[in-house]
Amino acid sequence: MEGFLGVCPLLWGKGCQQCFFLYLARRMTNDLAMENVEKKGVTLGVQRFVVNDFGECTYLLYGEGGEGILIDAGFLYDEEWEQFIDFVEKRRVTISLLLNTHGHIDHVCGVGRVLERWKVPFAMHSADVPLLLQGPQFGGAYARAVKGDLRPSILLESDPKFTFAGHPMEIIRTPGHTQGGCCFYLPEENVLFSGDTLFEGSIGRTDLPGGDFSQLIASIRDKLFALPEDCLVLPGHGEQTTIAKEQRENPFFS
């Protein structure tokens, strides 16, 4: 993307600017150190894909029966998509739901590919639908990726709970980075998908339309920091962290 080094810092916090180098080093799938999942003996797989020019983290959750949920489909380039397809085909995973933490272009530029292949429900908060529809303004490959009507079929208007492959999942509303921001929490596994709300050592940027610094701080402090301290946090950019580490070391709270 033209001007990437200038655009990249606008989308997420200070700590995530390093994702540019992460992206260059590994345009590939990434196995996660899912200690919280493994030590409970549960049967849930989680795979991370670091994709597009922003080093966005797309997450695939899949159960023993092959049911899969995709969080923040950011696949932009053919090689990224082909690598993802190879992964799900080898494991016989079928996507049953597409979830989005928010509507920024780096988190939605793969939505069209997913919906074309699986024709599954697409869930996102209604407040971020305008961001989704603004995607073509980015031009180039991003405009082509989000062409057509990609409006979500499910609107996350409250804090609902549902079950995926026998595993409860909670939707936590966390406005601030965007007005429609949400995080997804697996209580049995004690794992949080934080999108661009909370990063390792940083938080999401709030100087874009719809951003609100005070609101973001409150979302993290009142909702995310209420989770167990050993909760594993899987963010939308960068490396995993824990609630305890961010309470203790994150410069916005420590």
Report residues per predicted region.
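Aromatic (phenylalanine/tyrosine) cluster motif
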Residues: F4, F20-Y23
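Residue-level marker for buried hydrophobic side chains located in beta-strands
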Residues: I69-I71, L99, F122, F193, ...
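Metallo-beta-lactamase
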Residues: F75-L76, V93, Q137-A141, K161, ...
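Cysteine-centered motifs
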Residues: C8, C16-C19
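Conserved beta-strand hairpin/beta-sheet module of binuclear metal-dependent hydrolase folds
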Residues: K39-R91, C183-S194
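Short, positively charged and aromatic/hydrophobic N-terminal segments
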Residues: Y23-L24, N30
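Active-site HxH/HxHxD metal-binding segment of metal-dependent hydrolases
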Residues: L76-W81, I85-F164, E249-F252
